[in-house]
């Protein structure tokens, strides 16, 4: 048995007997299901919408090479830079090289599962670069020294009392803050982090082949701030995130929001199409997109496993 698998089994046996942990998880799942049951009413025929999305993803994955090359062509025409990474180390080296070129000492980050996949944060920390998670749930996990618990709700297993104690212990926040007060307290800390950051790093919800752009959907606005204040924006994504057209977002964004959080649409939906142009007054001076393989082409070659690349990371399962 692999050492990591052995450790997982040992820790999971302990966790399943933790009744308080189970209570918090069951509560979170119940709230998610209630939100989904309300939110799905935005679709007149949800099952047909899901089938249509699956068909689009099937066609895209079947012609993945074509759409990725189209994205690269369009994105570079807009002044963006595309980096292909076969494995995590190549992606990490690319990020580090950019940081060195920009003499970066601080990085702000929005939620990204692919950066968890390549273990970006500890890598940058080992090279003397300060990395701050700006999604509230991710920030809580970072302060706790823990990985995200769930791809949509990273700290769903923590109670408000636990978070209040954590903020008091780690950030010297007043004891016993309510959730709204904790949010305001975090905002005050992170605002200065955005201003001071040299580089902003985001994940990607969808790559748009026809216009050569990156689509990011969020509820807190932190991804926009990560890309607005720093002079350099790095977006890191798996190669399977591609969609043929910007028009597909009319289907995929509501599907993602409904299944992820029960919303009709998330609060902030942004399309990034490259670095700031000469006549534009905001945005990064440089934008990079790192396209990560890390075994995805092996999955693509496996007919039985290929369907897993249709996943849009809504977290509903």
Regions of interest found by a model, annotated:
Residues 1-306:
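The feature marks the mature, well-folded catalytic cores of soluble enzymes
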Residues 305-317:
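Cysteine-centered iron-sulfur cluster-binding motifs in ferredoxin-type domains/subunits
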């Amino acid at each position: 048995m692999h050492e990591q698998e052995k450790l997982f089994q040992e820790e999971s046996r302990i966790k399943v007997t933790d009744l308080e942990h189970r209570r918090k998880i069951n509560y979170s799942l119940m709230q998610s299901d209630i939100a989904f049951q309300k939110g799905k009413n935005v679709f007149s025929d949800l099952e047909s919408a899901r089938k249509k999305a699956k068909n689009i993803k099937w066609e895209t994955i079947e012609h993945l090479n074509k759409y990725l090359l189209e994205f690269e062509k369009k994105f570079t025409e807009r002044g963006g830079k595309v980096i292909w990474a076969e494995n995590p180390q190549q992606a990490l080296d690319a990020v580090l090289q950019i940081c060195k070129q920009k003499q970066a000492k601080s990085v702000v980050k929005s939620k990204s599962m692919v950066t968890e996949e390549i273990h970006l944060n500890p890598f940058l920390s080992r090279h003397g670069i300060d990395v701050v998670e700006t999604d509230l749930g991710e920030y809580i996990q970072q302060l706790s020294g823990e990985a995200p618990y769930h791809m949509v709700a990273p700290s769903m297993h923590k109670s408000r009392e636990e978070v209040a104690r954590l903020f008091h212990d780690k950030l010297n926040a007043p004891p016993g803050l309510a959730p709204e007060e904790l949010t305001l307290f975090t905002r005050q800390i992170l605002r200065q982090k955005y201003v001071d950051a040299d580089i902003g790093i985001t994940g990607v919800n969808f790559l748009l082949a026809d216009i050569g752009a990156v689509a990011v959907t969020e509820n807190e606005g932190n991804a926009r701030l990560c890309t607005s204040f720093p002079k350099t924006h790095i977006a890191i994504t798996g190669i399977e995130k591609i969609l043929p057209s910007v028009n597909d977002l009319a289907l995929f964004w509501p599907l993602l929001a409904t299944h992820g959080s029960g919303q009709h649409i998330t609060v902030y939906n942004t399309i990034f199409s490259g670095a700031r142009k000469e006549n534009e007054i905001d945005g990064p001076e440089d934008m990079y997109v790192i396209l990560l393989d890390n075994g995805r082409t092996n999955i693509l070659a496996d007919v039985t496993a290929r369907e897993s690349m249709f996943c849009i990371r809504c977290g509903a399962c």
